[in-house]
């Protein structure tokens, strides 16, 4: 019989984030695997604490980026509680499996022989934990959900937004895992480090081109949020090749730029549409700082115009005027640029007049 599969349905800030599916290594650590499996199904009823022996409704209470995410304290919710199906604590079963890669399930503890219900999922290799914590499973699907949890904002390692195991359970042998295949054609892991396929430069170019095309489809439909995600994802894959040297084909850097620059510019337009003005400023600045030999005049014009538009929305009229003037220099005939430049100047003049009147009243 194959190893058990279990799942968590995760919410972040009360919004569904997705499902994580685990394999439990019953063949190597049967007692530890059974504890986790039963806590996913809740089949053991109430524990000695008077709380249900179940992960359902419990939090990920401790998250450390580039290390691990920790949960399983369903009694106290802060890392001080939890309970196993065998009583409060049980012994370390064995240390056969090592913390040699991300997405492993391992038992949290307070020292030897103190396993309860708390667990963690590694997000990087953590060999310093070998011989101290029992590895008992791995993530099969839902790596992007783990990364979303890992990247949550925290204060003293606790997520600012509640990250909750809203539902959990066991999947029968042969049962569908409940994770829908991507409908938009995006079959790639959210982060390149988690992508198990080839990642040579030409592979990355192909992936990024596909993601950009998917982003463009969303953009044309007016779905700017999903379009933005695809453009950012494409950029993440392109960043797998952060630098170029004399050993690279001469045309390679240009091929990367030909995809990356449009992704940045499209992301900046999405940011404008979504009201993410600081993000728009950041992304367009990245474009303007790009190696100039790969920037077309229209790229520069778009970047200045969109950055100016973002600054207008944050009432930085002087900054907007500066950017619109630079866009106007690149394309003197563009009526839209002329209009926004005049608008920015009028807004700045009105602001100064208002400030002048306020000062006059103060000293009247």
Swiss-Prot record:
Organism: Rhizopus delemar (strain RA 99-880 / ATCC MYA-4621 / FGSC 9543 / NRRL 43880)
TPR repeat placement: 208-241, 261-294, 301-334
Domain PPIase cyclophilin-type: 7-170
Claim: Repeat is one of the keywords in the record: yes
Name of the protein this chain belongs to: Peptidyl-prolyl cis-trans isomerase D
GO cellular component: cytoplasm; intracellular membrane-bounded organelle
Annotated function: PPIases accelerate the folding of proteins. It catalyzes the cis-trans isomerization of proline imidic peptide bonds in oligopeptides.
Cell compartment(s), UniProt: Cytoplasm
Catalytic activity: [protein]-peptidylproline (omega=180) = [protein]-peptidylproline (omega=0)
GO molecular function: cyclosporin A binding; peptidyl-prolyl cis-trans isomerase activity; ribosome binding; unfolded protein binding
Protein family (similarity comment): Belongs to the cyclophilin-type PPIase family. PPIase D subfamily.
EC number in record: 5.2.1.8
């Amino acid at each position: 019989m194959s190893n058990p599969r279990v799942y968590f349905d995760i919410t972040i800030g009360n919004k569904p984030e997705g499902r994580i599916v685990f394999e439990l290594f019953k063949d190597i650590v049967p007692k530890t695997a059974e504890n986790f499996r039963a806590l996913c199904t809740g089949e053991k009823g109430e524990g000695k604490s008077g709380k249900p022996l179940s992960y359902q409704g419990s939090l990920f209470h401790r998250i450390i980026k580039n290390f691990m995410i920790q949960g399983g304290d369903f009694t106290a919710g802060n890392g001080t509680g939890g309970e196993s199906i065998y009583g409060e604590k049980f012994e370390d079963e064995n240390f056969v499996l090592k913390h040699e890669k991300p997405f492993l399930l391992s038992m949290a503890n307070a020292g030897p022989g103190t396993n309860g219900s708390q667990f963690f999922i590694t997000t990087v290799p953590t060999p310093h934990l070998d011989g101290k914590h029992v590895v008992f499973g791995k993530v099969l699907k839902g790596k992007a959900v783990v990364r979303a949890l890992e990247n949550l904002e925290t204060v003293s390692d606790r997520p600012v937004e509640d990250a909750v195991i809203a539902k959990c359970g066991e999947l029968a042998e042969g049962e569908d895992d409940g994770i829908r295949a991507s409908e938009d054609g995006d079959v790639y892991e959210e982060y390149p480090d988690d992508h198990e396929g080839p990642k040579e430069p030409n592979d990355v170019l192909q992936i990024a081109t596909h993601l950009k095309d998917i982003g463009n489809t969303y953009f044309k439909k007016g779905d700017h949020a999903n379009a933005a995600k695809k453009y950012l994802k494409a950029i993440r894959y392109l960043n797998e090749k952060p630098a170029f040297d004399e050993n690279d084909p001469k045309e390679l850097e240009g091929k990367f730029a030909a995809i990356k620059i449009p992704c940045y510019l499209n992301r900046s337009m999405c940011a404008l549409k979504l009201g993410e003005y600081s993000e728009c400023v950041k992304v367009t600045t990245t474009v303007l700082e790009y190696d100039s030999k790969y920037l077309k005049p229209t790229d520069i014009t778009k970047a200045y115009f969109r950055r100016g538009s973002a600054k207008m929305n944050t009432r930085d009229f002087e900054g907007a005027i500066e950017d619109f003037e630079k866009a106007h220099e690149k394309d003197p005939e563009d009526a839209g640029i002329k209009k926004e430049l005049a608008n920015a100047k009028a807004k700045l003049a009105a602001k100064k007049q208002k400030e002048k009147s306020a000062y006059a009243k103060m000293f009247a």
